[in-house]
Amino acid sequence: MFITRSRFTSYFRFHKLVVLAVLFIFPTAYAQQPLPPSGAYDASPYLGQVRNTYVYGDIWERPNLSKRDRSMITVAVNQALYATNELRLHMGRALDNGVTQTELSEIIAHVMWYSGFPTGVNAARVVAEVFSERGLPNIPSGASSRQPPADPELEFPDAYPQTPYLRDLLNQVVYAETWKRSELSPRDRSMITVAVGTALYASSEVRYHVGRALNNGVTQDEISEIITHVTFYSGFPTGVNASRIAAEVFEGRGLPLAGGRFPGAPYLGELIGGLVYGETWSREQLSTRDRSLATIAVTLAGYQSDQLRVHLRRGLDNGLTTQEIAELIAQVTLYSGFPTGVNGSRIFAEILRERGMPLPD
């Protein structure tokens, strides 16, 4: 179903009135549904529709994960992506959903090992502002300082012999210390690590931590739901990649697999068939050719090789010429870096050879 700007504006205003009315009558029951930030979707009303209908009207209401769990993984992913505005919003939402100050503090420290110190420093600054705005203590009462283990058990004693200091950090700090801290349970740590690995398209980390999550009490259905939830914050290519890997891990453990294209995250298939291709790709505001250009650019910049391959083929089918795609690769490379451009050029050359098409001049 397509909604014109005028119809959507009326719908959006009506939705806000309904939300305000329900909040007034049932403040506790509806406290979890946030109002859209003022003016946030003025320049992209369809994005606002997706936000209301799919993200908060559907995903956040699914029973497969608790609101607390969804808040934890959303904070973790937005930290990893350096999405400061969303991070601030979801830190407040996490506190409303039962995540404690101590847990928020610990999420930041945990995620930092997987997404880098700059993301941790940024998140620490943001959470301090959120605590201050809410009149909460600046230092969470349950947070503890470093307690290095005296005789750490090494999880990967033979890992990375070429970089022994990295091996020591991995074994002695990440696993023997951070993963053992009591501020978060092993289950919570596994959930946020699977979420961050999904968001960062870190395939090997997703593979390892899906297995570790199963060992730590995260169910198969919960892992599938984490992948689906994170998809809306880091993009569908990341969800497709994680779903494929999760399915392989489930199969390797003899766990039952759902049918369909995405057995690792079955609901993802419905969303891709409906929201992505059935609805968004069919909207008349952009041609399929232009949508292919945009999608190739994004998957190229994200080094998302599998999805880049899919959309390079789709771009050719949608009327893009080899010269246009070659030029697009060069253009995007200047903004995303030469490694992404070299990867894109290599994949495009493979596709052209498969199709018996000449390479661009």
Predicted regions and their residues:
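N-terminal secretory signal peptides that target proteins for export/translocation
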Residues: 1-13
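Short, structured motif recognition centered on aromatic/hydrophobic residues
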Residues: 70-78, 104-108, 189-197, 226-227, ...
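Acidic, glycine/proline-rich low-complexity segments that act as flexible tails and inter-domain linkers
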Residues: 31-69, 81-82, 88-97, 103, ...
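Transmembrane helix-bundle signature of multi-pass membrane transporters/permeases
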Residues: 111-112, 230-231, 333
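Bacterial N-terminal signal peptides
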Residues: 15-28
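Glycine-/proline-rich flexible loop or hinge segments
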Residues: 87-88, 108
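Short, solvent-exposed interaction modules
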Residues: 200, 302
